[in-house]
Amino acid sequence: NEQIEKICKAFDCPVVIDEAYAEFAPDTCLSLLDICPNLYVTRTLSKAFGLAGARIGFLITSKANMEAIRGNHVPYSVNSLSMKAAEIVLAHATEFKPEIERIIKERDAFLSKSYASFSFSNSKANFLLIQTPHIDKLLALFSQKGLSVRSYQQKNYCRVTIGTTQENQWIQEVLDAFEQEETNAMQ
């Protein structure tokens, strides 16, 4: 937050912070809105609330900024079904908290483990970035297990979404098998 505050104060222009994964992270910059009049925070209902298909999010900023934006708002930019879904989800937002907490707990369980053949980024989202020089082997194991992951082969990493407890067990099985294969290959 200190860096964001410095940026806001150093530049006389809008500063937009994307907090798409805010529900999974311990920090938010919302507390800066009172002292940084040029700060705009965007959020989405796609990640923690499961409305990716609805393509809906929202903006948090000062009242003065909102009034200025309203004059430039495109009418009907969000369809009525997405709007209704957003209203329902936001009215029941607290009901999502246990699931969000489960995802955080299971994500942190992955991150707490140490492996010789790969590493995790320090994720504050609902996914893990896994890096290994043998990414092709790891991707093949995920594929054999029927798990779909996002590949960034050129950079030797992949992205795995924290799913249900069962899906996370399958991910763990793949990671354990990969670790075992890599350990055996080194001997």
Placement of each model-derived feature along the sequence:
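Active-site pre-lysine segment of PLP-dependent enzymes
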Residues: 1-48, 65
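Short acidic/glycine-enriched loop/turn segments that link adjacent beta-strands
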Residues: 53, 124, 154-156
